[in-house]
């Protein structure tokens, strides 16, 4: 028989930098999970993606064991890295902060493809372009 799930926790943690301090500690402590065990395993799995924020979905079972699935970094984080900026525009309709080439957008869309509910890469590209537009980033050919 399958183990009974008691809690699902979704977090966004910098790759390779999970530690028991907030937000990780309190979120997992409430569920009674071995926090250090999670941190070590997460850091080992994400050590190759340093500098990116990795969304993670942790499933906690009745016997306090857990499994977790790492997702691809958010499109906004990948766009900021591609454009070389610290943050998006406060007024994206007025102030444009950077430009990104369309082939870079395709690359980001292909990276995000497993986590997006898009039929093809073109649809995923449109989603990423929409994120860029709302951040004040101009897409050029």
From Swiss-Prot:
Name of the protein described by the UniProt record: Large ribosomal subunit protein uL11A
Annotated organism of origin: Halalkalibacterium halodurans (strain ATCC BAA-125 / DSM 18197 / FERM 7344 / JCM 9153 / C-125) (Bacillus halodurans)
One biological process term in Gene Ontology: translation
GO cellular component: cytosolic large ribosomal subunit
GO MF annotation, one: structural constituent of ribosome
Chain's role: Forms part of the ribosomal stalk which helps the ribosome interact with GTP-bound translation factors.
NCBIfam families registered for this protein in UniProt: L11_bact (TIGR01632)
Gene: rplK1
Keyword Hydrolase tagged: no
Family classification: Belongs to the universal ribosomal protein uL11 family.
């Amino acid at each position: 028989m399958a183990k009974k799930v008691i809690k699902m926790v979704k977090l966004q943690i910098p790759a390779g930098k999970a530690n028991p301090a907030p937000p990780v500690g309190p979120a997992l402590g409430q569920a009674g999970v071995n926090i250090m065990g999670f941190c070590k395993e997460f850091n080992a799995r994400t050590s190759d993606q340093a500098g990116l924020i990795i969304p993670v979905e942790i499933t906690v079972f009745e016997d306090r064991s857990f499994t977790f699935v790492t997702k691809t970094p958010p499109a906004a984080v990948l766009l900021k890295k591609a454009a070389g900026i610290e943050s998006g525009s406060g007024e994206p309709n007025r102030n444009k902060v950077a430009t990104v080439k369309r082939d870079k957008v395709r690359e980001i869309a292909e990276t995000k493809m497993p986590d997006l509910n898009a039929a093809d890469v073109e649809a995923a590209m449109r989603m990423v372009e929409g994120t860029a537009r709302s951040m004040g980033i101009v897409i050029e050919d």
